[in-house]
């Protein structure tokens, strides 16, 4: 079941528990995120609400129904290295430079609180439109 933005406010932990508990999915793939990188510096609370605290709520809800949580993260967890010629590896040390990258790294940590999790680090996602799937 692909939920559009209007189907679940991931920053509302009660709604997250309700929807996950009702649907009882085998897996949850969280593609939702605060992606306004520059705005994250001036609105860190809103950024953290979506990229960290919402992931913690998803992890708790997934634990409640024994669902796999797949958390989509970002290459921003690594920061910037203008001299780097190779892609990052999963065991490279993160070092975010800004609030957006730090919030995505914190979201990864939140996902790891549930043993049945996977983290996918990517540099971008797209869909058919801004309204969701």
Predicted regions located by residue number:
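A short beta-strand-loop structural module common to alpha/beta enzyme folds
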Residues: 1-8
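Hydrophobic, aromatic-enriched interface-forming segments
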Residues: 128-133
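NAD(P)H-binding glycine-rich loop region in Rossmannoid oxidoreductase-like domains
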Residues: 10-52, 61-63
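Ser/Thr-glycine-rich phosphate-binding loops at phosphate-binding pockets of nucleotides
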Residues: 35, 74, 103
